[in-house]
C-alpha cells in the first residue's frame, strides 16, 4: 500500500490479505479475530499435522473450539507452505518465545520466522510481532535480522498478545497495545487493528509495548506469590484464607484480589517474570521481588505435598495412603499441562509412599501424569461417589467447571482444596 489513505481504504473494504505465523494458543485466536472482522486469513504453521487438522475443521486447542468456526467462515486457510505468505499484505508473528535450559530467551523461533518472511514477503509488507519478547527485541533482533537478509523495506510493528486461556473473554474486547518502528508502520497497524479490536492503544515505541507486557505478567507473578505466602500463614493460623480474602475484597480501593493455588503454571507467567528479571540483570538493576516470587513459586508444590501428608498423618492414615488428584491442567477449563503444579506434586506424593491416581475431564486421552520414577500413574475416568470415597485424600489442583464438586465435597474422606472449588458445596 503506497499511501496511508490507500491502506485505510483497503482496511475498510477488507481487501487486505492477512497472514498468521504460528497457529497455537496465540495465533489461532488471533486468526479467528481477523476472520470475524471480515478479513481473508492465511495461517502458517510448521506442524503439518496441525495444518491438516485445521483444514479438516478438527480442534487443536480444546479450550477454544475455533477450528470448525474458522473453516465455516470461508475466510481462513491453513498452510504448511511458507511461499503462500507471499500474497499477504500483513503478517502477524505468533511464534513461541521459550526459555532455554539456562533460563535465557531462546531466539531461534523468532530468527527463523524473520528469515522466512524476509525471503517470501512482498515489498513494504507489514509484520506485526505478537510474541512476548524483552524490550528491544523488535528493533534490535527482529529488524536487524530482516535487514541482514536484505529486507530493510519491510514495515515492522509490535503488538503483544493478551490471550487469557479459558477465561471466556473476547480477545477483541481486550485493549490492544501497539507500536511501530516507523511512523508508517505505527499508522498502518493502528489503522488495521482499529477495524478488529475495540480499543487499540498506540504507544510511543515498541520498547514500551514490550516492557508493558512483561510487567503485566510480572505483576501477576508477584501478587500470586504473595497470595500463596499469605495462604501459608492462614493455614498455620487455622484460618480460611478465602474467607479472609472475601473480607479484604470489600475495600473499594487499594486492593486487587489474587487467589492462592498450588503454584503457577502455563507458558506465560513463570517465563515472562524470568525474562524481566533477566533484563534487570543485563542493565544492572535489582530484581529482588521478582526473584523472591520465583522462589515462592518453586517452593509452593512442596508445601502442598507436605500439607497432604500432614492431613493424612492427622487422620492416622495407612503407610501407603491412596490420593486422588483432581485437575492436572495448570488452570481451570484449559487443556494445557505446561509447567502445571501437578507435574511436580504427583511425583513427590508417590516418592513419599502415596498411591496416586488422577482425574481430569478437560485433558485429552493422550495426557499422562507420572510418578517419581517416570511411570504413568493410573487415570480415573469417572468421578462418582463410589470412586471418591475409595481414596484417603482428594487433592484439588484445578477447579474445572465440568467436575461435580458437590460429589467430592460430600463423599471424600478428606480433601485438600488448593483452588476453593469445594467452598459452599456441602
Where are these regions (language model features)?
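Structural/interface elements that position substrates and couple domains in central-metabolism enzymes
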Residues: 2-426
Amino acid at each position: 500500500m503506497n499511501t496511508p489513505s490507500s491502506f485505510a481504504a483497503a482496511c475498510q473494504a477488507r481487501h487486505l490479505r492477512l497472514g498468521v505465523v504460528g497457529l497455537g494458543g496465540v495465533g489461532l485466536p488471533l486468526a479467528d479475530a481477523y476472520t470475524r472482522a471480515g478479513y481473508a486469513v492465511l495461517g502458517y504453521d510448521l506442524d503439518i499435522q496441525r495444518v491438516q487438522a485445521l483444514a479438516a475443521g478438527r480442534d487443536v486447542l480444546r479450550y477454544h473450539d475455533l477450528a470448525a468456526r474458522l473453516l465455516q467462515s470461508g475466510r481462513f486457510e491453513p498452510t504448511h507452505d511458507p511461499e503462500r505468505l507471499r500474497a499477504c499484505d500483513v503478517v502477524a508473528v505468533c511464534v513461541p518465545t521459550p526459555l532455554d535450559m539456562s533460563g535465557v530467551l531462546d531466539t531461534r523461533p523468532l530468527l527463523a520466522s524473520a528469515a522466512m518472511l524476509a525471503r517470501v514477503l512482498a515489498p513494504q509488507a507489514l509484520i506485526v510481532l505478537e510474541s512476548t519478547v524483552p524490550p528491544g527485541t523488535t528493533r534490535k533482533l527482529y529488524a536487524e535480522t530482516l535487514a541482514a537478509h536484505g529486507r530493510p523495506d519491510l514495515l515492522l510493528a509490535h503488538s503483544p498478545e493478551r490471550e487469557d486461556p479459558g477465561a471466556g473473554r473476547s480477545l477483541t474486547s481486550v485493549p490492544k497495545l501497539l507500536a511501530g518502528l516507523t511512523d508508517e508502520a505505527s499508522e498502518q497497524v493502528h489503522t488495521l487493528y482499529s477495524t478488529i479490536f475495540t480499543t487499540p492503544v498506540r504507544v510511543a515505541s515498541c520498547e514500551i509495548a514490550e516492557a508493558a507486557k512483561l510487567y503485566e505478567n510480572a505483576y501477576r507473578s508477584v501478587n500470586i506469590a504473595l497470595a500463596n505466602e499469605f495462604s501459608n500463614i492462614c493455614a498455620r493460623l487455622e484460618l480460611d484464607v478465602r474467607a479472609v480474602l472475601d473480607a479484604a475484597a470489600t475495600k473499594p480501593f487499594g486492593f486487587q484480589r489474587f487467589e492462592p493455588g498450588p503454584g503457577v503454571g502455563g507458558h506465560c507467567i513463570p517465563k515472562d517474570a524470568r525474562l524481566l528479571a533477566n533484563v534487570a540483570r543485563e542493565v544492572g538493576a535489582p530484581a529482588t521481588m521478582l526473584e523472591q516470587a520465583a522462589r515462592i513459586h518453586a517452593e509452593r508444590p512442596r508445601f502442598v505435598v507436605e500439607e497432604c501428608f500432614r492431613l493424612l498423618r492427622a487422620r492416622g492414615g495407612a503407610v501407603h495412603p491412596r490420593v486422588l488428584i483432581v485437575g492436572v491442567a495448570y488452570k481451570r477449563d484449559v487443556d494445557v499441562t505446561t509447567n502445571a503444579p501437578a507435574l511436580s506434586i504427583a511425583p513427590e506424593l508417590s516418592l513419599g509412599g502415596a498411591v496416586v491416581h488422577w482425574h481430569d475431564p478437560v485433558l485429552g486421552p493422550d495426557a499422562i501424569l507420572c510418578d517419581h520414577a517416570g511411570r504413568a500413574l493410573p487415570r480415573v475416568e469417572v468421578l462418582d461417589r463410589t470412586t471418591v470415597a475409595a481414596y484417603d485424600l482428594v487433592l484439588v489442583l484445578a477447579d474445572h467447571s465440568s467436575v461435580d464438586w458437590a460429589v467430592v465435597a460430600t463423599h471424600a474422606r478428606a480433601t485438600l482444596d488448593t483452588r476453593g472449588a469445594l467452598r459452599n458445596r456441602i
